[in-house]
Amino acid sequence: MHVEVRADGKVLLATTVALNAAEPVSVAWQKPDALVTITITANGKTIASYTEEKPDQLKKPPVKDPMPLAAEVQSADELYMAGLHVEQYRDPAVMPDAYFLEGLKRDPRHAGCLLGMAAYCYRMALLSEAENYARRAIKRLTKFNARIPSGDAYYQLGLILEAEGKTDEAYDYYRQAAWVGSSVSKAMTRTACIDLARSDYEEAIAHTKQVLTHDAKNPLAPVVLALSYRALGETEKADDVIEAGRQDDCFHMLLRWLSGMSEAHFFSKMDSEPAQTTLDMAFDLLSMGQAAQ
């Protein structure tokens, strides 16, 4: 491949190198004051090109202040937002529950902090505590309106109940969560997974199709759909779903596995970490009642 470096219309470097993704190549030139353009070509075609840009000093984001201690935050709302921030960026120095719990000291019925604690306890496998927080949050949110504008609280409680083995109740809460359009994809995906685990294949297919009308890129929907078709003996439809899904995402590991390829070929083309990838696949299949897969 040919590497060319230019600045102000002048060629600073022109050389041919052998590029290998596993071995970086270093080339040297005298750095000018002007901005540099680096172009890589092969057989007359541009493979890659990069031009330096002068930083825009006016558009630099403001420097963020360090996170305050929970006791230093003024209100329950701010504590809730601080907890969300810590949760989102996974700050190793602090856990989000410190902010949510402090928020609940200020306002024991603060719905956001209650839901934050429900999600936190769920991830920590403190399921009884998680259920308590989630139910308190829903009670608060539905004080004046039974149809709240977000399905997140119902969905979170559904996840907790399903983890506790209370599948029938979880199913009902997933359906309630799906009343809100923004929650249809995730809530009906879990509903369809439970349908499949119950061997209720027609319902699983119907609910999966509902998911796909709201989220065509949902990663679990084609898996549930293909397995349901197979269970009904409709192997051609199942194969079509798997093939279409793999055309859309050639790295979809569950669909690759269900396509029937050999185990050796499956692992030889896996770019992700095998142990974590196979664990993720196993957890998804188990949630569908597909231990045999």
Where are these regions (language model features)?
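Long, contiguous interaction/recruitment modules in multidomain scaffold/adaptor proteins
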Residues: 1-74, 243-269
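Residue-level recognition of tetratricopeptide repeat
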Residues: 84-85, 119, 159, 193, ...
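Structural marker of alpha-solenoid helical repeat scaffolds
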Residues: 106, 140-146, 180, 214, ...
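TPR alpha-solenoid repeat register
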Residues: 113, 146-147, 153, 187, ...
